[in-house]
Amino acid sequence: MNALFAALLVTVSAGNDKALHLYELNPKSGALTQRSKINLPGAPGSQFVSPDGNRLYVSVRTANSVAAYHIDHAKKTLVPLGITDIGANAAYVATDRTGRTLLWASYSGGVVGSHAIGRNGAVIKGGLSRIETARCAHAILVDASNTFAYVPHTCPNAVYQFRFDAKTGKLSKNEPFTSHPAEGLQPRHLAFHPKLPIVYFDDERGDSVTAYSLNRTNGQLKAFHTVSTLPKDFDGNKNSCADIEITADGKFIYASNRGHNSIAGFGVDAKTGKLKSLGQTPTGNTPRSFNLGPANKWLIAAGQRSHDLHIYERNPKNGALTKRHHQPTGQGPSWVQFVPVRKLKETAKK
């Protein structure tokens, strides 16, 4: 356990249950204990923890809304702050680097937008920006400078590029508006290298991860390296990639395979950012989402069709994953999220 954290909570979006399942992870064994179940007015999806670690945002997809929660570090629970109608079914939600603006991307609507976040952490109704792109907008994240935002789209096989104004919370189109990888890859989710000017996207139909160079001056992306997530003898027509994560030290990347039902691992070259396959680790049926813990010791993958969680301990030296636990969960888990609980300062005795 990281010295800063008193506990690790894990939240699971169970779409079929229309509920958020809350667990606590044992930092030594990796075992999960369920703490609560939060019912929602629609199917939950994407989740995001604010930069200060005090808020959790959850897309309530079928209600076209976003739910906000205060993370109560003393009681190790979530306190509801409200559910805000954003007028779109958000496949992905995130905040900017300051935590003052909520960003979202709608797969079915082909639109992205931003909303202000109030001082209490709730999302304020009435958007700051709303920009049409194309169908199949899968994710949205801002870069480390909080200046550029990227939205991978599978159907048009493109990454849509935006400028972000942290003062106003508004998105605007960058020029050129799109960056295209090789034909048929279909970028889905993304992860920024913590040191190098590189962004990695997992490719839904390409069964691969593609690295893009990031021009820190104009925000433009350019694909330069692609590596498969599958073993050579597996039929790629029976697979699609879903999620991607990079370790905090930038040394390893993981991507999930739906069909092959595995987590693919890669070593990252410290100078070039190019990837070397480390193989695949079996996991649950249709791993739509997985997440690395804050110290990168634990990785949890959610099997959307097996309705379960698979908990792995990660070797920090070689990136290998060792399965420690299997946990049944709610029906149709589409997202799993670590929620760190901080240690509270002891009150001085008077």
Predicted features by range, described:
Residues 13-15, 61, 107-108, 117, ...:
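Short loop/turn segments immediately following the C-termini of beta-strands
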Residues 33-39, 79-84, 125-131, 174-180, ...:
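A short beta-strand motif characteristic of beta-propeller blades
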Residues 8-10, 56, 102, 149, ...:
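Hydrophobic beta-strand positions that form the internal "hydrophobic ladder"
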Residues 23-30, 69-76, 115-123, 162-170, ...:
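Short loop/turn segments immediately following beta-strands, especially the blade-tip
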Residues 304-308, 313, 322-350:
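Blade-level signature of beta-propeller repeat domains, shared across WD40, Kelch, NHL, RCC1
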Residues 41-52, 86-100, 130-148, 180-197, ...:
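Beta-rich, blade/repeat-based domains predominating
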Residues 34-99:
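Blade-loop segments of beta-propeller domains
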Residues 7-31:
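An edge-strand/N-cap motif at the start of beta-rich repeat modules
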